[in-house]
Amino acid sequence: MLFKISLKNIRKSLKDYTVYFFTLILGVAIFYVFNAIDSQSVMLDVRANMMDIIKLMNDMLSGVSVFVSCILGFLIIYASRFLIKRRNKEFGIYLTLGMSKRKISVILFFETLLIGIVSLVAGLVIGTILSQFMSVIVANMFDADMTKFKFIFSMKACVKTLIYFAIMYVLVMIFNTFSISRCKLIDLLNAGKKTEKVTMKNSIICTIVFVIGVGILSYAYWMVTRGVRTLNTFDKIGIPIALGCVATFLIFWSVSGFMIRIFTSIKSVYYKGVNSFVLRQFCSKINTTVFSTTVICIMLFITISVLSAALSMKDSLSKDLDSMCPVDVQLAKYSYDAMSEAYATSQDMSEKDREMLEDSKLSIIETLNNSGFDAQKYFKDVAEYNIYNTGLTVKDTLGDINTDDYKFMADTIMPVMTIGDYNSVARLYGNSTYELNDDEYIIVADYKNMVMVRNQALKKGITLSVNGKEYKPRYNECKDGFVQIGVLNMNDGILVVPDNAVKPQQVRNMGLSADYRADTKEERYSIETQLDNLMKNISYQTSFISWNSRIDLAESSVGLGALVTFIALYLGIIFLISSAAILALRELSDSADNKERYGMLRKLGVDERMIDMALFKQIGIFFAFPLILALIHSVFGIKFINIILATMGMSSMAASIGLTLAFVAVIYGGYFLITYLCSRSIIRPVR
């Protein structure tokens, strides 16, 4: 009997449950999709190093899922609160007819169970379909062989989804039971006659608070842009964040009175059509949702900023790979003179240390050949070079230029190369080569922030003393270039001098850049594997040698890009649907409560088109308000993130911002449209 009542109630209130159903199904689908990546990655044919990166990504996503489940759990309980409130009169009738509160709780239990089962089944079906597309995206990201691709259903992700959402629904059932047990019959029966207590705030006080909020927010914006130099520790970064949250709350608390004061003074706008009705409705609503609107605004801000940053990082890590990694492999090794100096103060050298010191007398190719790796057989287009330590520091090359931002590297030894060595590397990389007179030097750099500082010094014609001889700059600016392969422009400066400017005993590092003698990807992987196995045995075991490769850098950049993108997408979608769902549920509840007010408009002669437009404006303003402030926050948040990314040599976020805004518009706009259509259905008279 109670089960039949529950089933009938769900059918009858289907339009009230539309947003709730939509959110639950979407939440289940997203939860399954991101947790199914673990099972789908098993079928990817990738190297062991790449599989380790994928495993790390899956572990991170699993941890994020715990946080996501808390967000969704809060959302479901919040939604249940509104749905129960909508049905207070119905529950009052049940009690009047003699039904006990325990039986009402059982009805709610069955309703929650049915909704849970339907949403889980529908969400898992949609999630399974979407996960197949996710498999293709993951495979493309990691450049995996798709020959083993097949339709896959992740039982592990399914069980995890069922467990997590089962816990959420149990909490909802407990909450519903608790809510019903506290209800009084008189309150339930009079629920439709009661309106939420709304206190219209003093407009003068609101204006003052609004100005204070804007002032605090302006200072927070200044801190993350012009005053960014003061934010040199993590705890200091929290200051503008805290100020922004407080200012956001103050703005939402005061905006109703502020808007009333502004618009009532503009008679032509206030009394046009039903604008006065729309404004009063919005202001009364914002007065009772200050905290939740603040939270929604902050979640939208986090979504826009984090997703833009993640997509920008992914693009920056992958787009310059070919130009920044023009060779297949690069090896480096400490020289004998450098290591002899390091061991000079050591009183007791082990046998292993003596062997490594002896090996430092050999070239990189000799070390490889002695270890069983035939460099001539596996390498081609080889460029060998030396990095020298002449005692010059970064501060010496900058002279009296203000280096407050780079104090930490002022005493760093300036790497020096001869023009002959640099040109041999540049020719191999396809970069520009240069010529020098006997008394000239060049600074080669590509890290933009440091290039700007160095250019100031070069324009002043700062002379440098190397081994007792003075050298002047050949150019009044840095020349673009690099020696160390990587994925970002992080060369903060190499001093290039004539071949006779340095001494052999000043060699600090030996370097080698080369391509593999291979024609296919398989052959490259084969050589890479042999070299990798060798390096595991000799790198800092029998030799002061290290290495890097294009394949390894590509895998690392792709892995990091995928990691930040998936986590940002996961959190972004959840934050978006949570924010939009809370607004939608609140609006639907208010539409039901205000049905009589819209009926009054009809009695006053307002036609349906104007009523629909009034509803559209009201819902539009309610949805737009937190979004507009979040977008303003994001402008300054993204500027701050741009500064951080620039210090890592990453590019602008312009392209990723557009993609993020489109993503927000689709999900947030979709909820707005559903809310408007459902609200319009609620307020229209029954025919």
Feature locations, PLM:
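Small-residue-rich transmembrane alpha-helices
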Residues: 29-43, 78-82, 115-144, 157-182, ...
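A hydrophobic alpha-helix feature that marks transmembrane segments and, especially
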Residues: 34-35, 65-92, 104, 176, ...
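Nucleotide-cofactor and metal-assisted catalytic machinery
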Residues: 321-562
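Peri-transmembrane interface segments
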Residues: 15-22, 33-67, 83-85, 227-247, ...
